[in-house]
Curated annotation (Swiss-Prot):
Its cofactor is Mg(2+). The gene is vapC28. SUPFAM superfamilies: PIN domain-like. It comes from Mycobacterium tuberculosis (strain ATCC 25618 / H37Rv). One of its GO terms (molecular function) is magnesium ion binding. CDD domains: PIN_MtVapC28-VapC30-like. The lineage of its organism: Bacteria, Bacillati, Actinomycetota, Actinomycetes, Mycobacteriales. Gene3D superfamilies: 5'-nuclease (3.40.50.1010). Its EC number is 3.1.-.-. This is Ribonuclease VapC28. InterPro entries: PIN-like_dom_sf (IPR029060), PIN_dom (IPR002716), Type_II_TA_system_RNase (IPR050556), VapC_family (IPR022907). Mg(2+) binds at D4, D100.
């Protein structure tokens, strides 16, 4: 399973639906995170200036045994195409941002479902991890 930044942030901020994302993580055979998404999570959490939540990211990555995947050339090309098709400036309802495009690309490249929060990826046709449970 590929995990998008949005799902990790929901868990670490203990949002209302955090349990659904935490359960999905716990039940997955493998949890993959793009290196770009790892950085994006860090940027989002570090902007809160709370060292506890900042450390919680690395603790989650370690405890849940995430595989942090480097961005390959193929994924970069898939992400570029995703931005052209589904990006914020494309007029498409998905409105994917930079990090979203890299999560999408990793899911397409690995042919694995994507765990995300929100409605953006639902407009792209990528397989949703929560639908598999």
């Amino acid at each position: 399973m590929i995990v998008d930044t949005s799902a990790i942030i929901a868990i670490l901020r203990d949002e209302d639906d955090a349990a659904a994302y935490a359960d999905a993580l716990a039940n997955a055979d493998v949890r993959r995170l793009s290196a770009a998404s790892y950085l994006e999570c860090g940027i989002v959490l570090d902007s809160q200036r709370d060292p506890v939540i900042s450390r919680a990211l690395d603790e989650l990555i370690e405890e849940a045994e995430f595989v942090v995947e480097p961005v390959t050339e193929r994924q970069a090309r898939l992400a570029r195409a995703a931005y052209a098709d589904f990006g914020r400036g494309s007029g498409h309802p998905a409105g994917l941002n930079f990090g979203d495009c890299l999560s999408y690309a990793l899911a397409i490249d690995r042919r694995e479902p994507l765990l995300w929060k929100g409605n953006d990826f639902g407009h792209t046709g990528v397989q949703r991890a929560l639908d598999r449970r």
